[in-house]
């Protein structure tokens, strides 16, 4: 028997055109021969009997019943005057979505489409404008402010009712999404809510909240494929402890007050690009399992990403932080981009770990920049960075290349105890001392590379230091170049040079370079006696106010030209117990 196309319109039934043309079914105007009339009538009776049976199957009856319940629930849900009735409609709609998704008599695509239509109805309610949303913070206060327009008490009640209905929708969706996620992810704790068996197809549905006015808390809820693009959050936006599955978008969202994503979990891609946070933005302890984009975001209030974990790429390119930004103990497994970012307040990256490349090129730090005790596992790119106040890299480790070429440092730069295991480039960098403001009075104006360790080549060629710079106890394991650098004063007491050192075309404006021990706790600068004597080059520019005073020193039957007071050492004479080299030459003279 050919497949029937059924239409409920006016009780008519339509047969496929192909079946009519093939003669399998009667068509308009068909008249059987007299000898076939009895046989044809019998066949038609069988056909319509089968059709009635097909129409009245339990599955068909259930589906028709759902459509009727949907119509009734929708009428309840759209009732704008009775919150209890609206809530009843919302519960029914959510339950109907469950029923469609678990109806195995239908193909998956049909089940998904029926459920998606219901979800679109619910999310459409969330997107509906609500005039009182903009007055949320006023209406949530205890007393009406002076000059309030309208009935304050009545508006308070109306706002609470609308908040209840809309948040209940999120809670009903969250309950189902949490159950589905908990059943598919091993090790997850079971959700505190109990629910009947749910279809995993809930995870395939789309939840469009784009452009919605959100004026209620959404903490500790579950979201799936949630689109909050261009949404406006009135009053505090609370996503504390929320869990997001599927791609999530907050692109161009407007947060009019404080926003909390503290402890939130983003299990897939999330985008906040072009969003605006007017108040404080709290992402401390948040977990990002996939790529996260905060590109071009504006943070007007304080931003807190302390203890945040990014397991993939983290993109903050061209973002603007107008107040303090706390990224202390940040952990990024993928490429972290802060390129061309503007930090208006203090930027703190203390004890952070960047496992892959970290890009800060062309960023501007208007207040102190603190990277102390951080670890850069991949290339650290700070080319062209501008720091207008102190820059703190004390105890920082650079496991790969560190590029500060063309960087501009102002006031106080501290690389004390930093370790550079890859090539370190400071070529054309500027270390500038500007007139102090009251805010900067506690910081001496100099650059500090004391105890810094450079395991590979170090390049300070054409760098400019308009403040005194100290390389006390610095360790240059391989070649270091200061070719063309400009100094006010440079101090290399107790520094160790393992291979070549190029000081040609240097300039010293106020104080001659010092390689001698100025204090008891310091020793003279040391140059390896196993290096090429031609690799140590000391030649100031003719116009330099101060130059090098050089002499000779001998060790291992080799003679070197060194600055007066510096010594040669034998790298093979290291005494582990005494923590010093035991074969040292007399000072150069």
Annotate each predicted stretch with a short phrase.
Residues 68-75, 81-91, 99-589:
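N-terminal leader/targeting and pre-domain segments
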Residues 24, 28, 36, 563-565, ...:
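Generic alpha-helical structural signal
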Residues 2-3, 16, 23-28, 32-33:
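Short, low-complexity intrinsically disordered segments enriched in A/P/G/S/L with frequent Arg
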Residues 2-4, 40, 63, 112:
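Short intrinsically disordered, low-complexity coil segments enriched in acidic
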């Amino acid at each position: 028997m050919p497949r029937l196309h059924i239409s409920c319109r006016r009780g008519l039934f339509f047969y496929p055109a192909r079946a009519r043309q093939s003669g399998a079914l009667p068509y308009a105007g068909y008249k059987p021969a007299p000898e076939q009339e009895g046989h044809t009538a019998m066949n038609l009776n069988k056909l319509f009997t089968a059709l009635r049976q097909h129409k009245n199957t339990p599955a068909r009856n259930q589906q028709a019943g759902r459509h009727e319940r949907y119509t009734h629930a929708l009428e309840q849900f759209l009732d704008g005057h009775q919150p209890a009735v609206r809530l009843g409609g919302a519960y029914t709609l959510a339950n109907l979505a469950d029923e469609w998704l678990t109806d195995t008599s239908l193909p998956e695509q049909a089940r998904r489409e029926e459920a998606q239509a219901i979800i679109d109805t619910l999310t459409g309610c969330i997107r509906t404008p609500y005039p009182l949303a903009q007055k949320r913070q006023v209406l949530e206060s205890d007393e009406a402010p002076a000059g309030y327009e309208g009935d304050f008490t009545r508006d308070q009640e109306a706002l609470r009712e609308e908040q209840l209905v809309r948040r209940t929708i999120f809670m009903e969706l969250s309950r189902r999404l949490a159950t589905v996620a908990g059943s598919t992810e091993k090790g997850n704790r079971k959700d505190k809510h109990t629910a009947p068996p749910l279809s995993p197809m809930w995870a395939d549905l789309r939840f469009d909240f784009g452009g919605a006015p959100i004026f209620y808390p959404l903490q500790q809820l579950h979201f799936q494929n949630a689109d909050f693009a261009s949404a406006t959050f009135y009053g505090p936006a609370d996503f504390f402890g929320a869990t997001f599955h599927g791609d999530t978008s907050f692109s161009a969202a407007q947060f009019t007050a404080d926003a909390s994503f503290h402890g939130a979990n983003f299990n897939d891609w999330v985008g906040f690009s072009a969003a605006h946070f007017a108040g404080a933005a709290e992402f401390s302890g948040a977990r990002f399992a996939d790529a996260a984009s905060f590109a071009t975001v504006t943070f007007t209030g304080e931003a807190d990403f302390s203890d945040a974990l990014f397991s993939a790429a983290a993109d903050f390119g061209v973002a603007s932080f107008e107040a303090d930004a706390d990224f202390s103990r940040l952990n990024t497994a993928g490429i972290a981009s802060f390129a061309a970012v503007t930090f208006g307040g203090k930027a703190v990256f203390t004890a952070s770990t960047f496992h892959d490349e970290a890009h800060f090129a062309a960023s501007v730090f208007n207040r102190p920049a603190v990277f102390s005790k951080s670890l850069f596992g991949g290339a650290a790119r700070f080319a062209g960075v501008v720091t207008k106040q102190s820059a703190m890299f004390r105890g920082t480790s650079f496991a790969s290349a560190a590029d500060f070429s063309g960087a501009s440092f102002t006031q106080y730069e501290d690389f004390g105890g930093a370790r550079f295991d890859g090539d370190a480039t400071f070529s054309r960098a500027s270390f500038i001392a500007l007139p102090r403001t009251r805010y900067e009075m506690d910081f001496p104006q100099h650059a500090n590379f004391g105890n810094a360790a450079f395991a590979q080549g170090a390049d300070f060629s054409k760098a400019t230091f308009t403040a005194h710079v100290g390389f006390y106890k610095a360790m240059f394991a391989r070649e270091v170049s200061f070719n063309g650098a400009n100094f006010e004063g440079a101090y290399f007491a107790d520094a160790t040079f393992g291979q070549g050192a190029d000081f040609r075309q240097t300039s010293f404006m106020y104080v001659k370079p010092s390689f001698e021990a100025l204090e008891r706790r310091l020793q003279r600068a040391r140059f390896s006696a196993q290096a090429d004597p031609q690799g140590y080059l000391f030649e100031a520019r003719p116009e330099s106010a101060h130059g090098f005073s050089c002499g000779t020193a001998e060790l291992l039957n080799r003679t070197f030209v060194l600055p007066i007071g510096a010594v040669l050492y034998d790298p093979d004479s290291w005494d582990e117990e005494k923590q010093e080299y035991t074969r040292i030459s007399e000072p150069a003279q």
